Amino acid sequence: MYESENASEHHPELEDVFSENTGDSNPSMGSSDSTRSISGMRARDLITDTDVNLLNIDALESKYFPADSTFTLSVWFENLIPPEIEAILPTTDAQLNYISFTSRLASVLKHKESNDSEKSAYVVPCEHSASVTRRRERFAGVMAKFLDLHEILKDA
């Protein structure tokens, strides 16, 4: 059903694919031949931007991929990191670490508590903060018990 492929590889034009596979140069899906086989085609090359913006996923599937059709779509991955970041962080590892760090930093800045025991006006309370606080307290209690046990065993 799906073939993995790199985004940098050449992808044929929609008209070329239809003319090669069906002999039809019209890429319209409204023709009577609904058993077209598109091998190695990307969905974004097949579906128009207008339809992507206007239709939901079920409508897109029924319009472009009828149940009686046979389609082989390619799976592709595109690098969405800006060129400036690629220049600073050339390896994939460094880029992933940067993305992870900045997302955690954004979360901390969004959900942090201010220094004076009241919440700042711009801080959005996290719905999980109470759960995290309870778990942190339980973990601290368990660690305290382990340290007490360690002291008892060390003195014995």
Swiss-Prot record:
Identify one Pfam family in the record.
Herpes_UL33
Q: Enumerate the UniProt keywords alphabetically.
A: Host nucleus, Viral genome packaging, Viral release from host cell
Q: Which GO terms describe its cellular component?
A: host cell nucleus
Q: Where in the cell is it found?
A: Host nucleus
Q: Output the GO biological process annotations, alphabetical, semicolon-separated.
A: viral DNA genome packaging
Region (Disordered) residue ranges read 1-37
Q: Which InterPro entries does this entry report, sorted A to Z?
A: Herpes_TT2
Q: Write out the biased-composition intervals (Polar residues).
A: 19-37
Quaternary structure and partners: Associates with TRM1 and TRM3 to form the tripartite terminase complex.
This chain's function reads: Component of the molecular motor that translocates viral genomic DNA in empty capsid during DNA packaging. Forms a tripartite terminase complex together with TRM1 and TRM3 in the host cytoplasm. Once the complex reaches the host nucleus, it interacts with the capsid portal vertex. This portal forms a ring in which genomic DNA is translocated into the capsid.
Question: Which protein family is named in the record?
Answer: Belongs to the herpesviridae TRM2 protein family.
Protein name, UniProt field: Tripartite terminase subunit 2
Its source organism is Varicella-zoster virus (strain Dumas) (HHV-3)
Gene name of the record = TRM2
